[in-house]
UniProtKB/Swiss-Prot annotation:
Classification via Pfam families: SH3_1 (PF00018)
Protein name: High osmolarity signaling protein SHO1
A Gene Ontology biological process term: regulation of actin filament polymerization
Transmembrane annotation, as ranges: 24-44, 59-79, 89-109, 118-138
Cytoplasmic side: 1-23, 80-88, 139-293
Length: 293
């Protein structure tokens, strides 16, 4: 867990997050191309000022500058895999970008000048991509349209991961540390006093006082309690991570995982799923960060 958390902390801009995602690659590429068309056409239209056409609208230049920052922001957010963190702010900026593009299109598209019409076409393309981005980043990760778009990137990443590890690695991985060893150690403190009253309660309390706050199970546990932990948990389901997740350091049961990572899941009920990684590490993972295969 510490190793995975360290890898998560070192994660920065990764071009694989864009190249491996067809949706991100297509929309970012189209927006960049549209911005170049609008920028070059605006320069040409500025030099072609006539008495009939009038001066080039200065408002369009502000839209060009604003869209350059918006496109760069989307690129950085997607490449750094931080959409879950900044999707609210990004949606707000995209909403303002749509309004600016609409006003600029209205002031350019009806002109008889060819350069202005070309600039208007570039702004139209940027507006179309902006609408798609607003729908994508404004939707919850569990939304079917967004999950469908993310599934293309996940399948591509899954194929490359299987080729790298020889294929079928998650199916043959074994759990070295069953998660019940940690769960039962925490639950025994609550389960022992409940069915036993009177003298047995004091005996159980005395047996727990010495090993309190130890990471390993207490030495006074009977063999019957260890037998409950021995049977391994089966993981009939498989899931893929939509986003990266860093485990809470205060909760030893959580596990960290990276985006597009394949996990094995034992139970899909509730908000937290019992999962197992390819390395054999087990723990609980938030269900809204995973998608079932």
């Amino acid at each position: 867990m510490e190793q995975s958390r360290a890898q998560y902390g070192r994660k920065g801009i990764n071009m694989g997050n864009i190249i491996g995602d067809p949706f991100a690659l297509a929309t970012v590429s189209i927006s960049m191309l549209a911005w170049i068309i609008a920028f070059i056409s605006s320069i040409i239209a500025t030099t072609q000022v006539t008495n009939d056409s009038g001066s080039f609208p200065p408002f369009a230049w502000w839209t060009v500058v604003y869209m350059s920052f918006v496109i760069a922001g989307v690129f950085v957010v997607v490449a750094s895999d931080t959409a879950q963190t900044y999707h609210v702010a990004l949606t707000g900026y995209l909403g303002a970008a749509l309004a600016l593009n609409s006003l600029t299109i209205h002031s350019l598209i009806y002109s008889a000048n060819g350069a202005r019409q070309a600039a208007g076409a570039g702004f139209i393309l940027m507006a179309m991509v902006t609408i798609v981005w607003i729908f994508y980043f404004g939707s919850a990760p569990s939304a079917k349209p967004r999950a469908y778009l993310d599934s293309f990137a996940l399948q591509k990443e899954s194929h490359s991961r299987q080729m790298m590890y020889g294929g079928g690695r998650p199916e043959t991985s074994t759990s070295v540390q069953p998660p019940q060893m940690y769960t039962s150690a925490q639950l025994n403190g609550f389960e022992n006093p409940s069915p036993v009253q009177g003298i047995s309660t004091t005996q159980a309390r005395n047996s727990v006082v010495a090993p309190t706050f130890n990471a390993t199970p207490p030495a006074t546990k009977g063999p019957g309690q260890d037998q409950e932990v021995v049977p391994p948990t089966e993981y009939p389901y498989r899931a893929k991570a939509i986003y990266s997740y860093e485990a809470n350091p205060d909760d030893a049961n959580e596990i960290s995982f990276s985006k597009h990572e394949i996990l094995e899941v034992s139970d899909v009920s509730g908000r937290w799923w019992q999962a197992r990684k390819e390395t054999g590490e087990t723990g609980i993972a938030p269900s809204n960060y995973l998608i079932l295969l």
